[in-house]
């Protein structure tokens, strides 16, 4: 890892480096853009380009110092068309006071003043230069500086500050936005010093699948199944064998107390009690004509 050119106060802690590695921020793609080559550490035998984590931290601190230099936080616009970054930009905007655009970027938001979504930010931060290319292109038309989370294959045209990181994994995207928000709050003085822990956990910045969350809630709310009922019966000591034994004894007791009625004594002979059947011809009326 290359030595840091930052002052000692901005050096990354071992915990920050471990979090970046755990979130796989150092794993790029197999393609390498020529302008991202200075941030490359090495290429693995399987072709994956590994990003220098030290460079990633330096660019996070540089981007945080640029953001903190803007007086009005509402003049900062954070953008993410990629689903994995939408929750992160919303949380970043809530904690730093920026304006978030999560989802589709409306064309003309920076150039067409007639549109309802027209904005004039002083700085924009995008999650992926490829998916957020429309926002970067419009920012270049009106001279708005751009900070972007760039992978090894990301286009860097019109990007002023590139933060080299994995911008395709949900944990990597959420962690970089969380670190950026924490550094901004430290530079603004919201957090007393670098030793003060931020009470916001990084999990809040991670993408969550709505369908998976809904399925989890339904599974937790459903009634206990057959397995749970069987387990409860075993715990009480009254299992399936107990039910059979109890049922057999109950039926035996009922059979012994009540005897069946004597049909032979009361009914007599069925053959003698039944009247002889007459012929069908005799039942027909005399005046009825035959067809």
UniProtKB/Swiss-Prot annotation:
Residues 256-291 are annotated as: Disordered. Keywords: Cytoplasm, Ribonucleoprotein, Ribosomal protein. It comes from the Eukaryota. The keyword rRNA processing does not apply. GO terms for molecular function: structural constituent of ribosome. It is found in: Cytoplasm. PROSITE patterns: RIBOSOMAL_S2_2. GO terms for cellular component: cytosolic small ribosomal subunit. The keyword Ribosomal protein applies. One of its GO terms (biological process) is ribosomal small subunit assembly. Pfam families: 40S_SA_C, Ribosomal_S2. Required for the assembly and/or stability of the 40S ribosomal subunit. Required for the processing of the 20S rRNA-precursor to mature 18S rRNA in a late step of the maturation of 40S ribosomal subunits. Belongs to the universal ribosomal protein uS2 family. Component of the small ribosomal subunit. Mature ribosomes consist of a small (40S) and a large (60S) subunit. The 40S subunit contains about 33 different proteins and 1 molecule of RNA (18S). The 60S subunit contains about 49 different proteins and 3 molecules of RNA (25S, 5.8S and 5S). Interacts with RPS21. HAMAP family: Ribosomal_S2_euk (MF_03015). This is Small ribosomal subunit protein uS2. It comes from Coccidioides immitis (strain RS).
